[in-house]
Regions:
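Extracellular/lumenal and peripheral-membrane lipid-interaction modules
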Residues: 1-105
Length: 105
């Protein structure tokens, strides 16, 4: 799943906001009855590489991807693993898009 959202703030400010709020970006919500645990997050320049584990009951699946911050956009590119079988991509995309937009305000 890939989402791109435009912004009009300085790139460094967006990187700082993403880093500060990363855990909140992927935390569980009422729309997603899943517990998300951050396994790894590493910045390389303006690209954040991440690895998460999504757990729903006895089932768990890895989620990995990147968050790339440019001068005008934030792009989240994530492999949702088996997560897509339990939550529609549309729901996951909506929740993640709303959270990134909230982060950019």
């Amino acid at each position: 799943m890939r989402i791109t959202i435009s912004h009009d703030r300085p790139k460094a400010e967006i990187i700082e906001a993403v880093d500060r709020s990363f855990n909140d970006l992927f935390k569980s919500s009422a729309q997603l009855p899943v517990k998300i645990t951050v396994q790894e997050r590493t910045w390389r320049g303006s690209i954040l590489n991440f690895a998460l584990t999504a757990k729903w009951g006895l089932l768990s699946t890895p989620i990995k991807g990147t968050v790339e911050v440019t001068d005008h956009d934030v792009t989240v590119d994530a492999d949702l693993g088996l997560f897509n079988r339990f939550i529609s991509e549309k729901t996951a995309r909506t929740v993640l898009t709303d959270r990134v937009k909230g982060l950019l305000k």
